Amino acid sequence: MNLTSLPHTIHWHGLLQRGNWQNDGVPGVTQEAIKPGEDFTYHFIAAPSGTMWYHCHVNVNEHVAMRGMWGPFIVDPREPLPLEKTVTRDFILMLSDWDEKWADKPGYGGVPGDVFNYFTINGKAYPDTQPLRVKKGDVLRVRLIGAGELIHSVHIHGHVFKVAFKDGHALPAPYDADTIMVGPGERYD
């Protein structure tokens, strides 16, 4: 049930909608926006496994960036890969950016040379971001999700990433990276 005063949909990044296009959440294309007071039930098979995310697809600038209408969507595999079985801590970092001057202007957004007001991790800008607290010996899975309009460079001082998944899919050969460049909609584990 849409209990807000604005229309909404949910669009799924990475979730396959084979034979189920009407649940993809693109207003005016796969469904009509859900008006205030109306309801819509999304039906889908949670496949493939991996790191995905969802967001409102109506006035994306305002609803995603300013109102935070997005989140991670994780589908666990039936049979984890050997590398996944070594993980002791799992962190999700949704990287976003926004500029208040574009918030209420559907179809507008960052233009070349534009400087955004805020850069966020899980919807929080520094100094309100949360630290990743770990213990010596922990094996971390860090799920990076590009939920903004810009490319975000991610680097953890004193450590190297082992990139094993891209856009929810296992890579044939994981690789080491000092810095990961996460673009809009991309996911890295």
Regions found by a protein language model. Name each.
Residues 1-189:
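Copper-binding active sites and cupredoxin-like electron-transfer domains
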